[in-house]
């Protein structure tokens, strides 16, 4: 696989599933001006209790020649649900096992009682247990042909109609879509395409504009670099210089063996191509650390300390060091991400994130609809220079899957930046999150709202409340609940008028 497309693909796999320089909303500067939601006070860890259920879905919602169906998995929790004045909070599943996303979306559980909400977590087709063709689902592009955002949204639509029809008391209840990362994109698009089924959507860390020249391709890597620059003196500069240090050592007679031993690699480097793979892996590691730069210990992609970027930067205080020292510093920094638990005996360049993410499914989506360009120049960012090469990317996709990407289809389907006719969507983005560069970070209308979260990483607002949360994310969650309650109020006003 080509260099630029491999890096993009690795980034997208870590996605899941965004502008650091944007001004902070005045409301975020005055947290005392908004009543705090009682849902976010310090509380003991909640035990998640849900039922696992399945619904038969059509493999193809839009054609009439295929009658095949499959079982879509979904989770449902109704502990706090009330028929009178209640709500349905519907999580639009990402590119992975839905139980994993359920366990990492504590915000919904935190507000369930206050919102009198039934919680529904819908698994995305081709991920987790929701496989349209079972073991053959990833065998070729013919079986993968039904892995599209449109088909996934149709699954969600049918599931909502089914729940309202079969659960007593749910028929006239409003539904709010929620999601983070790719799931956040789906939540926003779901509100756009099915406004009669959901009264609003919370799209957290949803880079809906990371497509087809809607934003510069280098914005992602620039934000990663800013995170590291702000987290330690000389940190980003040291990383920028580290690539040449690796290259110089690799060219020496015993360089590959020395690098393998110094970095404690599980699989030794044996050829020059392995060096590029090593650097790709290291690059993705720094990206992932920036994404999950949470203010407390976490275990989202990997077990990590609080503020992991700052911890990593402790090993990059000095940029003018011998190459061997630089590589030893790289090893110590990599250990923060891959061996915080202290149990790893070696570092595996094939490992970057949790196995709960669906690698095969996402690589196909990245080769069809979800074409999200990234590039770097090595000057305004800390990575090696790599341009975006659409032809190379397309050729790699064709070689792997036998398909050609359609980079303009998502903007065509969902409107690109021309979305002002839609309503009731909250776009929340953390300033630390690289994906914020492709997200909506300024209000579009009075009902298409943007919240930029200072000191916030990838969909931090969707995570469970924590005593170490910055005030900015506490306020963000209260704002989100405030807007959702307004949508509910407006919904019941319209319902009474109809009756």
Curated annotation (Swiss-Prot):
Cysteines engaged in disulfide bonds, as pairs: 217-375, 235-313, 266-346, 367-397
Cellular-component GO terms for this entry: lysosome
Leading EC class: hydrolase
Example of a GO biological process term: negative regulation of systemic arterial blood pressure
An annotated Gene Ontology molecular function: serine-type carboxypeptidase activity
InterPro entries: AB_hydrolase_fold, Peptidase_S28, Ser_carbopepase_S28_SKS
Main location: other
Residue numbers covered by the propeptide annotation in the UniProt entry: 22-47
Gene3D superfamilies: alpha/beta hydrolase, Serine carboxypeptidase S28, SKS domain
The organism's place on the tree of life at top rank: Eukaryota
Catalytically driven reaction(s): Cleavage of a -Pro-|-Xaa bond to release a C-terminal amino acid
SUPFAM superfamilies reported in the protein's UniProt record: alpha/beta-Hydrolases
Signal peptide range in chain numbering: 1-21
Keywords: Carboxypeptidase, Disulfide bond, Glycoprotein, Hydrolase, Lysosome, Protease, Signal, Zymogen
Pfam families per record: Peptidase_S28
UniProt-listed Enzyme Commission number(s): 3.4.16.2
Glycosylation sites: 103, 234, 339, 348, 418
Localisation per UniProt entry: Lysosome
Function, in words: Cleaves C-terminal amino acids linked to proline in peptides such as angiotensin II, III and des-Arg9-bradykinin. This cleavage occurs at acidic pH, but enzymatic activity is retained with some substrates at neutral pH.
PANTHER family the record matches: LYSOSOMAL PRO-X CARBOXYPEPTIDASE (PTHR11010:SF38), PROTEASE S28 PRO-X CARBOXYPEPTIDASE-RELATED (PTHR11010)
Record family assignment: Belongs to the peptidase S28 family.
Subunit organization: Homodimer.
Protein name: Lysosomal Pro-X carboxypeptidase
Taxonomic path: Eukaryota, Metazoa, Chordata, Craniata, Vertebrata
Gene: PRCP
């Amino acid at each position: 696989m080509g260099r630029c497309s491999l890096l993009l693909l690795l980034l997208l796999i870590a996605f899941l599933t965004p502008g650091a320089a944007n001004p902070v909303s005045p409301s975020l500067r005055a947290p005392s001006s908004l009543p705090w939601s009682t849902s976010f006070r310090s509380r003991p860890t909640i035990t998640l209790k849900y039922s696992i259920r399945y619904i038969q879905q059509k493999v193809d919602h839009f054609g009439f020649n295929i009658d095949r169906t499959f079982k879509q998995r979904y989770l449902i929790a109704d502990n706090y649900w009330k028929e009178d004045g209640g709500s349905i909070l519907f999580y639009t599943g990402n590119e992975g096992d839905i139980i994993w996303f359920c366990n990492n979306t504590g915000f919904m559980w935190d507000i369930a009682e206050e919102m009198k909400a039934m919680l529904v977590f819908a698994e995305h087709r081709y991920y987790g247990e929701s496989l349209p063709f079972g073991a053959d689902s990833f065998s070729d592009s013919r079986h993968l042909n039904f892995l599209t955002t449109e088909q996934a949204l149709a699954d969600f639509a049918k599931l909502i109609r089914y729940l309202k029809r079969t659960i007593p008391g749910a028929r006239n209840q409003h539904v709010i879509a929620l999601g983070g990362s790719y799931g956040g994109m789906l939540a926003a698009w779901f509100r756009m395409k099915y406004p009669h089924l959901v009264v609003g959507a919370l799209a957290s860390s949803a880079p809906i504009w990371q497509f087809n020249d809607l934003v510069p391709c280098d914005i992602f890597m620039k934000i990663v670099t800013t995170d590291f620059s702000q987290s330690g003196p000389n940190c980003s500069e040291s990383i920028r210089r580290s690539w040449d240090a690796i290259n110089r050592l690799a060219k020496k007679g015993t360089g590959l063996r020395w690098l393998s031993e110094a970095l404690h690699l599980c699989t030794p480097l044996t050829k020059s191509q392995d060096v590029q793979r090593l650097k790709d892996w290291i690059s993705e590691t720094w990206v992932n650390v920036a994404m999950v730069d949470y203010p407390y210990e976490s275990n989202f992609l990997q077990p990590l300390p609080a503020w992991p970027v700052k911890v990593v930067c402790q090993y990059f205080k000095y940029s003018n060091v011998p190459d061997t020292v630089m590589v030893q510093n790289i090893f110590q920094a990599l250990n923060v991400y891959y061996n915080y638990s202290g149990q790893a005996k070696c570092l595996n360049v094939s490992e970057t994130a949790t196995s709960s993410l669906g690698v095969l499914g996402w690589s196909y989506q990245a080769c069809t609809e979800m074409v999200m360009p990234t590039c770097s120049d090595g000057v305004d960012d800390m990575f090696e220079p790599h341009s975006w090469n659409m032809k190379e990317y397309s050729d790699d996709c064709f070689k792997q899957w036998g398909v050609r990407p359609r980079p303009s289809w998502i903007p065509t389907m969902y409107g690109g930046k021309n979305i002002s006719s839609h309503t009731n969507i909250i776009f929340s983005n953390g300033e630390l999150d690289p994906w914020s560069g492709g997200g909506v970070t300024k209000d579009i209308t009075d009902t298409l709202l943007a919240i930029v979260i200072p000191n916030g990483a990838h969909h931090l607002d969707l995570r469970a409340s924590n005593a170490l949360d910055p005030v900015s994310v506490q306020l963000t969650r209260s704002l989100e609940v405030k807007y959702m309650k307004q949508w509910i109020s407006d919904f019941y006003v319209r319902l009474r008028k109809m009756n």
